[in-house]
């Protein structure tokens, strides 16, 4: 792997530790968050530096309901340093929907200089397909799929694939390649604009009926 993105749900608070960890391992980091729109569709906001990602995460987090989070029921929501020491516990439930609509998330991401990518658009939960039934017209930088075809028309947008890993063992199960002199956020942005990024590990048409992970 040459580039790795950290996109926690509705927060980017772990971006500083992630930057240091990637520097240690010689991997180019992408920063961001997997936002939940007010329609309850997941959206990736990807950035080339921690600062805009942190601002994106701050606005997302502040828009979440203030209802108390139950760590016993749902597990801990922690911010760590580069040595995995816990420095903060987040009190708002990160799985909930933000106050931003899909289009509002796109404007915010672009305002901060990021890439606006609807996540796993063909899944049966928390996707534009499951929530809206179609991909609304908008200024997406790419569209993330888990299968080659079926369910939803992704239009003219570049299709990518990502691990969507919630445990280490799932990292790299799906991934995207693109040609560049060196891996960087700018090179990725150009590759998406020119449709020179290619998804790997997504399911074939014959696998569509199989359970999703």
Identify the meaning behind each predicted range.
Residues 1, 12-58, 77, 93-94, ...:
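Charged catalytic cores and adjacent phosphate/nucleic-acid-binding surfaces used
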Residues 5-7, 11:
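Ser/Thr-glycine-rich phosphate-binding loops at phosphate-binding pockets of nucleotides
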Residues 10, 87-98:
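Divalent metal-binding segments
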Residues 48-91:
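Active-site gating loops and adjacent loop-to-helix segments of metal-dependent hydrolytic enzymes
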Residues 98-108:
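Phosphate-interacting basic helix/loop segments used at nucleotide- and nucleic-acid interfaces
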């Amino acid at each position: 792997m040459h580039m790795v993105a950290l996109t926690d749900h509705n927060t980017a608070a772990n971006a500083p530790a992630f930057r240091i960890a990637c520097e240690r391992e010689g991997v180019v980091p992408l920063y961001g968050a997997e936002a939940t729109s007010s329609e309850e569709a997941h959206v990736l906001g990807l950035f080339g530096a921690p600062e805009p990602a942190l601002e994106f995460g701050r606005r997302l987090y502040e828009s979440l309901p203030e209802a108390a989070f139950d760590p016993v029921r749902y597990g801990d929501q922690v911010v760590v340093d580069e040595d995995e020491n816990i420095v903060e516990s987040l009190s708002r439930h990160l799985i909930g929907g933000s106050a931003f609509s899909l289009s509002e998330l796109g404007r915010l991401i672009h305002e901060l200089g990021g890439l606006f990518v609807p996540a796993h658009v063909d899944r049966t939960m928390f996707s534009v397909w499951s929530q809206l039934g179609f991909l609304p017209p908008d200024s997406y930088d790419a569209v993330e799929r888990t299968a080659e075809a079926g369910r939803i028309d992704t239009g003219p947008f570049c299709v990518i694939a990502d691990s969507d890993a919630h445990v280490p063992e799932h990292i790299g199960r799906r991934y995207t390649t693109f040609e560049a002199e060196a891996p960087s956020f700018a090179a990725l942005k150009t590759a998406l604009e020119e449709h020179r990024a290619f998804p790997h590990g997504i399911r074939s048409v014959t696998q569509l009926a199989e359970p999703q992970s």
